[in-house]
A protein has these predicted regions:
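Phosphate-end processing signature that detects enzymes handling 5′-triphosphorylated RNA
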Residues: 2-159
Length: 159
């Protein structure tokens, strides 16, 4: 009798009190929305997506305080055809834990994240850096599928 091996087919991801559903819409922008400038407060985010997994290490720096938050995240879409709903689990890491996990091969994405209020909602506006320089995305979250389905395209976004 051989040793049982883990595969995607025989490994379950059970419901967890630590994981939650994220409902988000993302929109492509040409630039920052009118009224928001690069000089405004933002967070500097570095995401390292561990090759071959659904895992990332996210480092978030507030340039006003020079303080960091580091999260180890699993994020996946239960329906591979619908990325508007994802299951996300975060674990906060110490600097030593983050350094230990940095040994894994990963694809890095860097961006500056701005908060933007529009139409009674808060949007995160991401301006990408490095290889994705010039890409600007807006995202906003929803409490329910119905709220998400009925939300109109914001005036500052492309269809």
């Amino acid at each position: 009798m051989g040793v049982a091996k883990l595969t995607d087919q025989n490994t379950l991801v059970p419901d967890s009190k630590y994981a939650h559903v994220e409902r988000e819409r993302r929109y492509l922008l040409e630039d920052l929305p009118e009224g928001l400038t690069r000089a405004e407060h933002h967070l500097q985010i570095t995401d390292n997506y561990i090759t071959g997994t659904r895992l990332r290490i996210r480092k978030v720096r507030d340039p006003r305080t020079n303080k960091w938050v580091v999260k180890f995240t699993q994020k996946f879409a239960p329906n591979p055809n619908d990325f508007s709903r994802t299951i996300i689990t975060n674990t906060y890491l110490s600097a030593i834990e983050a350094e230990m996990l940095s040994m894994f091969n990963a694809n890095e994405i860097r961006k500056n994240r701005y908060k933007f209020e529009f139409g009674g909602r808060t949007f995160s506006i991401d301006m990408f850096l490095g290889d994705l320089f010039g890409l600007v995305l807006a995202e906003t979250g929803f409490e329910s599928d119905e709220e998400m389905a009925n939300f109109p395209l914001p005036a500052f976004a492309h269809s």
